[in-house]
Regions:
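Active-site-proximal alpha/beta segments of enzymes that process anionic O-linked groups
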Residues: 1-28, 33-192
Length: 192
């Protein structure tokens, strides 16, 4: 079964090393249904992402211009994004390690805050979110901590992370899985 293969591949992940005289915080955001052509970060004339624009101006945000998801479905994209396989070389996601496990073995603290976590285990999305990302073995190999609840708004999820799990180590991988543009814009932010 694919999930068992993914667990085996992640268990075999090589232990990496990191320099003792440096520190690094990597923030990985799964934005969900983000349409780059509707954001001024990619040249859209309206200021639709003012906070991201400020972060870019401060040098805190790198904009990728040549990345395209291989799939239009979250479940397939997440499995192939979180594993180290090459789709170009026709490698299967479950034959390669889960990249957060590699970071953790290298000495990083790894945090995963997910606003789409659900108790549903049926269907394609349920399989991805629960059976894969929250498999007990993969989770113990990969996460220092993960969120145990979801929020109405994405900014509440991020606030919860910084309130409850500020990074304490020198090396941190912080991952946020947001609702993003999956839901109606009027429902994405508080009206105040």
């Amino acid at each position: 079964n694919e999930l068992q293969e993914a667990v085996k591949a992640s268990c075999k992940a090589e232990k990496g090393t990191i320099a003792d005289n440096d520190s690094l915080n990597v923030v990985y955001i799964i934005g969900e249904s983000f349409i780059k052509y509707h954001t001024n970060l990619y040249g859209y004339p309206l200021l639709t992402t003012p906070r991201l624009t400020k972060e870019k101006a401060k040098g805190n945000l790198y904009i990728f211009n040549d990345v395209v998801s291989a799939y239009a479905a979250t479940s397939l994209t997440i499995r192939n994004t979180f594993c180290c396989n090459s789709l170009m070389d026709k490698e299967k996601w479950y034959h390669t390690p889960f990249f957060p496990a590699i970071f953790k073995r290298a000495g990083f603290d790894v945090y995963y805050w997910d606003n789409q976590k659900t108790d549903v285990t049926e269907g394609l999305t349920g399989f991805t979110t629960n059976s894969f990302l929250y498999n007990k073995t993969i989770a113990s190999l990969s996460y220092t901590a993960s969120s145990d609840k979801t929020f109405r708004y994405d900014d509440q999820l991020i606030q919860d992370y910084f309130k409850n799990k500020k990074p304490t180590g020198k090396y941190n991988l912080i991952m946020f899985h947001l609702w993003g543009q999956h839901i109606d814009a009027a429902s994405r932010y508080p009206h105040n």
